A protein has these predicted regions:
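ASCE RecA-like P-loop NTPase motor cores
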Residues: 1-268
């Protein structure tokens, strides 16, 4: 459909996004491979790809990634993952005294974590994305209460911008692999390697979108906290290298004390 609408007429089409690429290694075509496959972009006829542009923001000076390396598997040991993940989340939230946006792929995970946090005596308000409610109202509460924590999913990964001191800790609660749907399942069914050709590129694009919520201007600072152990170097999955190489933040640690020191150095 995209090919018929945009690439087979005399009208010139420009496609632009901060997350068109799902890799940083290889040729320009390699970096756009998933986009090319999904859209039928006419690279062999008259299509032109531009070199991916680096972010203008000083990510490596202003941000660090903390990621867990000791949590249960999110799907194979789901109940244990939620329990241990909540404990680690609270540790992370205490570093920044709130000021955190926590992103979820699954609404059920978000609701479970919210219920668990409500049972703890935490020194900051926990806000949650509400069905049918005005999201702008929730976001305004988050902006005004600078020590609050906001749990969200869906459009919160890419559709919001919160600058300044209200957000200095962006938490990814579980890597955002795509939820199975007919489109994803069809792509996987025709792929040579469904994991590396479909699910990992989808996850990387979503992860980049989520991480992009943290640094919204030249003065924003903070940490990204990934509550998931599947990106550790010795994990049996094959995607940790391609994932790390695709992210704009290169400073990372599994030591929560190092993340805390960095946070207090750059955020005060």
């Amino acid at each position: 459909i995209l090919s018929k609408l945009y690439f087979r007429s005399k009208i010139r089409t420009i496609m632009t996004s901060a997350t068109l690429t799902s890799a940083t290694d290889g040729s320009v075509n390699d970096q756009y491979a998933y986009f090319l496959h999904n859209t039928g972009f006419p690279i062999e006829r008259n299509g032109v790809l531009s070199e991916p542009k680096p972010s203008p923001y000083p990510y490596d000076e202003h941000a660090m990634i903390y990621f867990c390396d000791d949590l249960p598997h999110p799907t194979k040991e789901h109940a244990a993952f939620i329990e241990k993940g909540v404990d680690r989340l609270i540790q992370v939230l205490n570093i920044s005294h709130g000021k955190a946006l926590v992103l979820f792929t699954a609404k059920t995970d978000m609701e479970e974590v919210y219920a668990a946090l409500q049972g703890r005596d935490l020194p900051f308000n926990i806000l949650i994305q509400q069905d049918g409610a005005s999201q702008e109202r929730v976001l305004q509460k988050f902006r005004e209460d600078t020590n609050s924590v906001l749990l969200g999913t869906g459009a919160y990964w890419e559709g919001i911008s919160i600058e300044g001191k209200s957000l200095s800790n962006l938490v990814i609660f579980r890597l955002p692999f795509p939820v199975p749907d007919p489109i994803i399942e069809y792509k996987a069914s025709i792929a040579k390697d469904p994991l590396m050709d479909v699910r990992v590129p989808e996850m990387i694009i979503k992860l980049k979108q989520g991480i992009g919520r943290l640094i919204r201007n030249y003065t924003d600072t903070g940490i990204v906290s990934i509550i998931d152990s599947r990106l550790r170097d010795d994990h049996p999955e094959r995607y940790h290298d391609v994932t790390w190489n695709s992210l704009p933040i290169h400073r990372r640690t599994t030591d929560i004390r190092e993340a805390e020191r960095f946070y207090h150095e750059v955020c005060g």
